[in-house]
Amino acid sequence: MGVKIDINRIARDQFILVDNQPYKVVSYEHVKPGKGQAFVRVKAKNMRTGNVTEFTFKSSDSIELADFEQRFMNYSYTDGTYYYFLDTNTYETFAVPAEAMEHEAQFLKEGMQVVVFLDRGNPIGIELPKHEVYEVIETEPGFKGDTATNTLKPAKIETGATVQVPLFINVGDRIKVDTEKGTYIERVNK
């Protein structure tokens, strides 16, 4: 059983338990209506299913924090149903269900170090590095002088994900991507 905290102390990226289901807080908002009691609106991702749900709590409520073990592991491979990660300290392999990693899966590359969350020894989800460098494998060609950064085009990166990039990005360029938002940050020198 986790520690209970006042709902007003909730923070982004905290792990909470709602109806015995583990969630990661994506966003929250304190609302004080003109009439009636203040409340907190919480958007949270179910760590087992990957679904994002919105909850509303009275400002007087308390919520239970989930207590997960966090381990650094390296991504190995997928069989379509599970994603497999290697704990480099114990050489144990852990399988995370694909449905729990819908967003994260598109930015995983072989050997990438991630944080795996374990609930009583069972993996329930991962956290990618905030920023990661990827190679562009497919995009429309850029032209010399295309330096306007407010116009974007789609580019496919080595993992198969598509990211919107400035016009000057070409196939073979390496780019830094915000893995949480799936957005381009900058071009990286080779």
UniProtKB/Swiss-Prot annotation:
The keyword NADP does not apply. Pathway: Protein biosynthesis; polypeptide chain elongation. One of its GO terms (cellular component) is cytoplasm. It is found in: Cytoplasm. CDD domains: S1_EF-P_repeat_1 (cd04470), S1_EF-P_repeat_2 (cd05794). Keywords: Cytoplasm, Elongation factor, Protein biosynthesis. InterPro entries: Elong-fact-P_C, NA-bd_OB-fold, Rib_uL2_dom2, Transl_elong_fac_P/YeiP, Transl_elong_KOW-like, Transl_elong_P/YeiP_cen, Transl_elong_P/YeiP_CS, Transl_elongation_fac_P. Pfam families: EFP, EFP_N, Elong-fact-P_C. Coiled coil: none annotated. One of its GO terms (biological process) is peptide biosynthetic process. SMART domains: EFP, Elong-fact-P_C. Its main location: cytoplasm. One of its GO terms (molecular function) is translation elongation factor activity. PANTHER family: ELONGATION FACTOR P, ELONGATION FACTOR P (EF-P) FAMILY PROTEIN. HAMAP family: EF_P (MF_00141). This is Elongation factor P.
